[in-house]
Amino acid sequence: MRIDFHASPEPTLGVEWEFALVDRRTRDLRNDATHLFARAKPRLPDPDKLHKELLRNTVEVVSGVCHTVGEAMADLRRTLEVVVPAGDDLDLDLYGGGTHPFASWTVQQLSEGHRYEELINRTQWWGRQMLIWGVHVHVGMPERDRVMAVLSSLLNFHPHLQALSASSPIWSGIDTGYASNRALMFQQLPTAGLPFQFERWSEFEAFVGDELVTGVIEELSEVRWDVRPAPRIGTLENRICDGVPDLADLSSLVALMHCLVVDLDTRAAAGETLPTMPPWHVQENKWRAARYGLDAIVITDAESNERLVTEDLADHLERLAPVADRLGCSEELAQVAQIPVRGASYQRQRAVAERTGGDLVAVVDSVVRELRAGLG
């Protein structure tokens, strides 16, 4: 099967930021996306920057095609400055965690759409439990034949991104012991989770052809890998990160993803064979980061060397500094180092729960406040 990749001549950025809708008083989920759209979209200069998702308790705020992290953040901010007040009119808040700490999946309502209906019809119990939210970052790729090499090498940084963004420690009222319960929930869907590490684009084309012929998917977008090509728009899409509560953490993570992809693609274009790890190391790293977050000891190379994820991260931030300078995101990349200092979202949520004697409403409050504080 032929899949055309509409290459992007520049390493442009696009960001998709998912939010849960929570009630102002109870802090439980509200299936009110339709009402929020009705309030917010007429006020938006570009209504297409606010999307529906699988469940009616979810909205997605998206940027346009941007050239810098700062431009993408400003674009998202402009949309949120309309959507958040529209939520105020409905006694709704936007919640940026990877999971909700106490909501029940049994009362959530499905959004209208054939694709969503088919997903639930096929996946049943697991699909209905997808009370999860994340951030997706697209980076433009100039050459189709480098996409799979960059994708495979980017998986070396899966645990770093997972640990930094982890924001889903509590599920159904219980602390799971995981920094990112979302990561392990989402991979229960049959086409989600870690990607296959193909060497050539033709292998990816053959895979998609097999999936279509056997009825596993109806369209390419149903391949829901943690990192995947987006051929129609010429990007590599990074879907590793949990939901992010505020603009500060988001700008740092987007800068890191932008720099990583551009660095790897530049090296591949220069003829370098990019470093990769065997799938069993990649799989183990994902589990370790989901379980231990910033305390994870991760495998760093194909020779099975290991290191604390934050120590390894510090070296990569230093190495990527010249890339960030070229991309105009030096300040945002430098702020990545502050996430472990401040505490990742999963750590901040646990601290609130401990301080309040396990009050999960207070946990939701704290996540909501972070978004509002960042908007000013």
From Swiss-Prot:
<comment type="similarity">
    <text>Belongs to the glutamate--cysteine ligase type 2 family. YbdK subfamily.</text>
</comment>
<protein>
    <recommendedName>
        <fullName>Putative glutamate--cysteine ligase 2-3</fullName>
        <ecNumber>6.3.2.2</ecNumber>
    </recommendedName>
</protein>
<comment type="function">
    <text>ATP-dependent carboxylate-amine ligase which exhibits weak glutamate--cysteine ligase activity.</text>
</comment>
<keyword id="KW-0067">ATP-binding</keyword>
<dbReference type="GO" id="GO:0042398">
    <property type="term" value="P:modified amino acid biosynthetic process"/>
</dbReference>
<dbReference type="InterPro" id="IPR050141">
    <property type="entry name" value="GCL_type2/YbdK_subfam"/>
</dbReference>
<keyword id="KW-0436">Ligase</keyword>
<dbReference type="GO" id="GO:0004357">
    <property type="term" value="F:glutamate-cysteine ligase activity"/>
</dbReference>
<dbReference type="GO" id="GO:0005524">
    <property type="term" value="F:ATP binding"/>
</dbReference>
<dbReference type="InterPro" id="IPR011793">
    <property type="entry name" value="YbdK"/>
</dbReference>
<dbReference type="InterPro" id="IPR006336">
    <property type="entry name" value="GCS2"/>
</dbReference>
<keyword id="KW-0547">Nucleotide-binding</keyword>
<dbReference type="Pfam" id="PF04107">
    <property type="entry name" value="GCS2"/>
</dbReference>
<dbReference type="InterPro" id="IPR014746">
    <property type="entry name" value="Gln_synth/guanido_kin_cat_dom"/>
</dbReference>
